[in-house]
Amino acid sequence: MTRTRIGALQDFGRSSVTRVEAVDDEGHLHTVAVARIGDDFYAIGDRCSHADVSLSDGTLWDDECELECPKHGSAFSLRTGEPQSFPATRAVPVHTVELAGDDLFLILELRP
């Protein structure tokens, strides 16, 4: 598990998506879309599983807790990473965001 500071609370506006990068314990770079909905934070892999497009450039749907790919419109659950609409059929990675004081941390868990 890798815990990386990704910024201060005020760096992440409400109803916004921010692209961040973090390096895990094995030296692999992860690009992650961090979404803020109200006081809740979500983090998913930033690349659409259907097209190699940045999800952080897409549309955030607060009420559905989904992030829509800007290329073909697949929406991904911010809670599970599962696609909610076609053409994507594979999930994207989900990570944890932790708030400590005014600092936000991204938790990357290594999967076997």
Predicted regions and their residues:
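Short loop/turn motifs at secondary-structure junctions and domain boundaries
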Residues: 66-67, 87
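N-terminal pre-ligand scaffold of iron-sulfur
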Residues: 1-62, 78, 93-112
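Positions that flank functional sites
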Residues: 63, 84, 91
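Cys/His/Pro-rich metal-binding microdomains
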Residues: 49, 67-70
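Flexible, glycine-rich terminal cap/loop adjacent to redox cofactors
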Residues: 53, 70-75
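C-terminal "cap" of GNAT-fold acetyltransferases
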Residues: 75, 89-92
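Amphipathic, hydrophobic secondary-structure cores in small proteins
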Residues: 57-59, 74, 83-86
